[in-house]
């Protein structure tokens, strides 16, 4: 009996195994068919997001995975399923009667679904890298790119159509504005013309006018410089016409200008140092000058009274002509020597005038007294306050020329001869 029971149990187990294997094979075939259909639809571009087809139902397994793809490639085909069936028939089952009954009850309650067999995972990465399910993340498709780009173009076209509408609205607004201004009595064209004219006038005022500065004239005239240089060249025994050489004439003129400028600046500096400690417009004389002037006036009055007494007594006529001649000769001699030294022929009027003319009119009142005093040469004490002359005087120019060695010797001697104290 035990032998028959075990054989019956083995027969039941093999039947259940065959049913499970056939169910697994049918499920795997359905899965492969669904995968092939999904791949064909992806290649033909039927997987757009805007399609109205209902999403595929996910096959729920007892492992708790939501994806339709198995996590591992089990490599189940029809050939392998047949081999597994033959192996299951040939090999006896390792389960006991208790385990098989529990396993069979669990399989019967699983609604035709079975657990996957323990098969080693495949090493083919290309199959794993290509997702076949619609759920989860997926790579972009060709048709999706085209659809997006075309949609973007349509959006751009729509957006490009908007500014045209805005431009038309702005034109209508401008026309309405012009109508309103025209009805108010404002001429837009005249206002624009006035605005442009005012802007142009402001620009012309802001720009400075071009100033045409004339050329600086030469310090010395070129003809005069050429004549002087020709004369100097003849003295040096060579003849050259400098009239055709304007650069040389300009150089000589500029050098003379610099020479004179240096002399004048030195003269001005010396005159300023000379007048530095003296107040030009003081308006007040010193007490010493006032006392000397009063003494000179008193001496002149005393001399006039003495001359009157001598004329009244008849004592003034003795040896007057000899004294006048002797004084006149002395003054003429001194004037001649000074003229020879200075090289000038000018003579002062008070030395050349004759002194005999006032004596011819003697005996006629106060004129005789003045003539007698003039004949005696006693005109009293001349008063002169010590004041510095304003500006540049001869002393300043001579002081500036004394520092120069070339061409200034004769000028200095003539200048000192002409100074009048």
UniProtKB/Swiss-Prot annotation:
Residues 1-13, 66-112 have a biased composition (Polar residues). Residues 226-294 form the Histone-fold domain. Keywords: Nucleus, Transcription, Transcription regulation. GO terms for cellular component: transcription factor TFIID complex. It is found in: Nucleus. GO terms for molecular function: DNA binding; RNA polymerase II general transcription initiation factor activity. It comes from the Eukaryota. Its main location: nucleus. One of its GO terms (biological process) is transcription initiation at RNA polymerase II promoter. InterPro entries: TAF4 (IPR045144), TAF4_C (IPR007900). Coiled coil: none annotated. Pfam families: TAF4. Residues 19-53 have a biased composition (Low complexity). Residues 1-176 are annotated as: Disordered. The 1.2 MDa TFIID complex is composed of TATA binding protein (TBP) and the 14 TBP-associated factors. Belongs to the TAF4 family. Functions as a component of the DNA-binding general transcription factor complex TFIID. Binding of TFIID to a promoter (with or without TATA element) is the initial step in pre-initiation complex (PIC) formation. TFIID plays a key role in the regulation of gene expression by RNA polymerase II through different activities such as transcription activator interaction, core promoter recognition and selectivity, TFIIA and TFIIB interaction, chromatin modification (histone acetylation by TAF1), facilitation of DNA opening and initiation of transcription. This is Transcription initiation factor TFIID subunit 4. It comes from Vanderwaltozyma polyspora (strain ATCC 22028 / DSM 70294 / BCRC 21397 / CBS 2163 / NBRC 10782 / NRRL Y-8283 / UCD 57-17). The lineage of its organism: Eukaryota, Fungi, Dikarya, Ascomycota, Saccharomycotina. The gene is TAF4.
């Amino acid at each position: 009996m035990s032998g028959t029971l075990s054989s019956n149990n083995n027969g039941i187990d093999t039947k259940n195994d065959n049913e499970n294997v056939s169910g697994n094979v049918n499920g795997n075939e359905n899965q492969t068919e669904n995968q092939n259909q999904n791949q064909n639809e992806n290649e033909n571009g039927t997987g757009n997001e805007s399609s109205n087809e209902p999403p595929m139902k996910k096959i729920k397994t007892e492992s708790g995975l939501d994806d339709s793809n198995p996590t591992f490639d089990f490599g189940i085909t029809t050939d392998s399923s047949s081999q597994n069936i033959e192996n299951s028939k040939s090999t006896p089952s390792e389960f006991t009667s208790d385990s098989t009954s529990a396993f069979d009850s669990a399989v019967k309650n699983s609604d035709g679904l079975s657990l996957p067999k323990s098969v080693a995972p495949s090493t083919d990465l290309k199959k794993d890298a290509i997702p076949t399910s619609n759920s989860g993340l997926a790579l972009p498709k060709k048709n999706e790119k085209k659809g997006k780009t075309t949609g973007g173009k349509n959006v751009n076209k729509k957006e490009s159509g908007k500014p045209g509408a805005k431009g038309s609205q702005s034109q209508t607004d401008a026309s309405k504005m012009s109508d309103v201004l025209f009805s108010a009595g404002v001429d837009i064209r005249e206002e624009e013309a006035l605005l442009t004219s005012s802007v142009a006038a402001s620009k012309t005022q802001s720009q400075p006018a071009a100033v045409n500065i004339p050329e600086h004239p030469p310090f010395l005239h070129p003809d005069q410089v050429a004549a002087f240089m020709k004369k100097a060249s003849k003295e040096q025994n060579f003849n050259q016409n400098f009239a055709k050489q304007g650069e040389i004439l300009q150089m000589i003129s500029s050098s003379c200008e610099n020479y004179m400028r240096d002399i004048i600046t030195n003269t001005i500096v010396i005159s300023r140092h000379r007048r530095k400690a003296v107040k030009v417009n003081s308006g007040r004389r010193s007490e010493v000058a006032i006392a000397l002037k009063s003494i000179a006036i008193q001496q002149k009055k005393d001399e006039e009274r003495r001359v009157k007494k001598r004329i009244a007594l008849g004592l003034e006529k003795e040896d007057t002509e000899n004294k006048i001649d002797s004084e006149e000769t002395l003054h003429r001699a001194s004037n001649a020597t000074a003229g020879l030294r200075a090289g000038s022929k000018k003579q002062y009027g008070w030395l050349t005038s004759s002194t005999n003319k006032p004596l011819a009119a003697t005996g006629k009142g106060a004129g005789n007294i003045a003539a007698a005093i003039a004949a005696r040469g006693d005109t009293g004490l001349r008063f002169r306050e010590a004041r510095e002359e304003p500006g540049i005087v001869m002393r300043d120019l001579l002081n500036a020329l004394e520092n120069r060695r070339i061409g200034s010797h004769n000028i200095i001697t003539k200048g000192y001869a002409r100074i009048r104290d």
